[in-house]
């Protein structure tokens, strides 16, 4: 990465921090004036009405900062960014169109509420816009041992994977700082990977979202319940999910030679493992118990960890650090152990952790029942 690219990445990172830092207090004020608040409920952990429009600042901040950086490059006649922008114009145009559609869907959902059928249709249209620009999981059939399947199956498989990632990010957003923290880990990982792949325009977008999320994380986690705290809402989680699934698939399209020390598919999947594994477990649980898999409950991993006795803050830190350590450990061991063995180890670890959580919850429930019996 040249000095020019480093300056651009630092500039867009700083601009996003500045824009979000200025915008969020104003969005909070608007939310209180219009009563656009997320009210406490049985399934939710917050105790006071809280603005849920933090995510409405994400896409405008990205587009404004991106435009400023491009404009500066045009004025100063620095050609590196402009050349890469021209070569990647179609996928970039497609992802911004998809982001705008997701943004509109999220705003409607945060203000009026949108059914999951409408969400699924809108998400499907958004991901198809990206796929038809050439962003697809071309090696997914081989990876899943489905090489004999016809070529046309690439499109539905890619669409399914993208919608799955979007909803995984949306559903993990259950406690303060968790979704934004996990996404920061993901964007940092993808940003570094794209630097090694010499795909600096995508590194730029990755680090831009890190800049978007840092001030939001501060307000979301450290803001007091009254007047300072804010949630990202569906607007934010859908925006983050859309960009993450786009960068995820772009990373799998990079030449494997540019990432000699780790399999590109594994690297793309690693930062998203916790939300994706959690969604698979929750959906399986709901189906096994005869419930609609698309209707919310309090059975996500963060809910379960809180029920074991951990605080909300400790749960958030534990899951974010686990994601970062899981990613780092897999990267370090990939050459020695191989992709399939590492993936099997990751799945086994996830199962063991969930079994331990189940045992802890059963023991706590047993203690509670015994104490109630003693009181009677």
Indicate where each model-derived feature is located.
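"…together with the soluble PPM/PP2C metallo-phosphatase catalytic core" -> "…together
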Residues: 2-277
């Amino acid at each position: 990465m040249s000095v020019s690219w480093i300056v651009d990445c630092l500039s867009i990172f700083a601009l996003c921090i500045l824009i979000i830092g200025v915008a969020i207090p104003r969005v909070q004020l608007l939310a209180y004036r219009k009563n656009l608040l997320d009210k406490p409920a049985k399934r939710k952990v917050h105790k006071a009405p809280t603005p849920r429009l933090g995510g409405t600042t994400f896409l405008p901040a990205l587009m404004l900062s991106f435009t400023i950086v491009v404009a500066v490059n045009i004025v100063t006649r620095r050609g590196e960014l402009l050349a890469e922008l021209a070569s990647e114009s179609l996928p970039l145009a497609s992802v911004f169109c998809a982001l705008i559609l997701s943004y509109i869907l999220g705003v409607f959902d945060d203000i009026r509420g949108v059914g999951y059928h409408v969400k699924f249709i809108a998400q499907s249209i958004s991901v198809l816009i990206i796929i038809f620009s050439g962003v697809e999981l071309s090696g997914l059939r081989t990876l899943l041992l489905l090489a004999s399947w016809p070529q046309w199956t690439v499109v539905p498989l890619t669409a399914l994977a993208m919608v799955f990632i979007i909803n995984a990010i949306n559903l993990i957003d259950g406690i303060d700082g968790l979704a934004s923290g996990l996404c920061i880990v993901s964007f940092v990982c993808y940003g570094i990977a794209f630097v090694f792949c010499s795909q600096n325009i995508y590194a730029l977008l990755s680090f831009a979202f890190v800049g978007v999320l840092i001030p939001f994380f501060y307000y979301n986690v450290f803001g007091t319940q009254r007047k300072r705290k804010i949630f990202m809402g569906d607007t934010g989680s859908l925006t983050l999910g859309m960009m993450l699934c786009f960068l995820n698939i772009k990373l799998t399209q990079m030449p494997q030679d540019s990432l000699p020390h780790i399999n590109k598919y594994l690297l793309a999947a690693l930062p998203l493992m916790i939300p994706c594994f959690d969604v698979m477990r929750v959906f399986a649980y709901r189906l096994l118990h005869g419930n609609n898999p698309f209707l919310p409950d309090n059975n996500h991993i963060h809910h379960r960890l809180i029920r074991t006795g951990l605080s909300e803050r400790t749960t958030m830190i534990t899951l974010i650090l686990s994601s970062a350590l899981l990613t780092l450990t897999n990267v370090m061991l990939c050459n020695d152990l191989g992709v399939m063995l590492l993936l099997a180890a990751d799945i086994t670890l996830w199962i063991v952790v969930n079994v331990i959580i189940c045992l802890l919850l059963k023991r706590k429930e047993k203690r509670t029942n015994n104490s109630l019996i003693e009181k009677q």
